[in-house]
Regions:
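A generic structural signal for short beta-strands and their flanking turns/coil linkers
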Residues: 33-37, 49, 68, 90-92, ...
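Short solvent-exposed strand-capping/beta-turn motif centered on an Asx-Ser/Thr pair
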Residues: 41-46, 99
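Beta-strand signatures of extracellular beta-sandwich domains
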Residues: 52-56, 106-108
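C-terminal interaction-tip segments
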Residues: 1-33, 38, 97-114
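Hydrophobic beta-strand residues in large extracellular and virion-surface proteins
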Residues: 51-53, 94-96
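Intrinsically disordered, low-complexity Pro/Gly/Ser/Thr-rich segments with frequent PxxP/GP/PP motifs
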Residues: 59-93
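Short active-site-adjacent structural elements
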Residues: 49-50, 62
Length: 114
C-alpha cells in the first residue's frame, strides 16, 4: 500500500479554549490511524502570542495538551512536533487556540496507517 501523506492548515485560529480550531481530524475507521509527523505554528501578528495545541481523543472524549500557553514571539514559529510521532486513532483531532488570532498552523500527517 502506498503512503498517503497530507498537509493540514489553519489560519486565524480560535482565541477561546472552549472552542479551539480543528486543524485535522483522523480518518474514521477501526483499522486506520494517522501519524502526526510535524506541527508548526507561526505568529503572523505584531505582538507575541501564546499557543496551546491539543489532541482530542475521541474514544475518551477528552483533550490532552501537547503544549500549553507556549510563547511565540513576533515573526517567529514554534515546532510543536518535529521528529517524534503522535498516533491519532479514528476521529481524533488536532486542535489549536491562541491568545490572538494571528497564528497559522501547518501539520504534516501520514494517513491510513494500518
Amino acid at each position: 500500500m502506498a503512503n498517503n501523506f497530507k498537509n493540514a492548515f489553519a489560519t486565524s485560529v480560535s482565541t477561546t479554549s472552549g472552542s479551539p480550531t480543528d486543524v485535522y481530524t483522523s480518518n474514521n475507521g477501526s483499522a486506520c490511524n494517522s501519524i502526526l509527523i510535524e506541527l508548526d505554528v507561526a505568529n503572523t501578528g505584531t505582538s507575541a502570542v501564546q499557543v496551546t495545541v491539543l489532541i482530542r481523543d475521541s474514544s475518551a472524549n477528552a483533550a490532552f495538551h501537547i503544549v500549553k500557553n507556549a510563547p511565540v514571539p513576533v515573526g517567529s514559529a514554534l515546532k510543536v512536533v518535529s521528529g517524534q510521532k503522535v498516533v491519532l486513532n479514528g476521529n481524533d483531532k488536532i486542535q489549536v487556540y491562541a491568545s490572538a488570532a494571528t497564528v497559522d498552523v501547518v501539520a504534516s500527517i501520514l494517513q491510513d496507517v494500518t
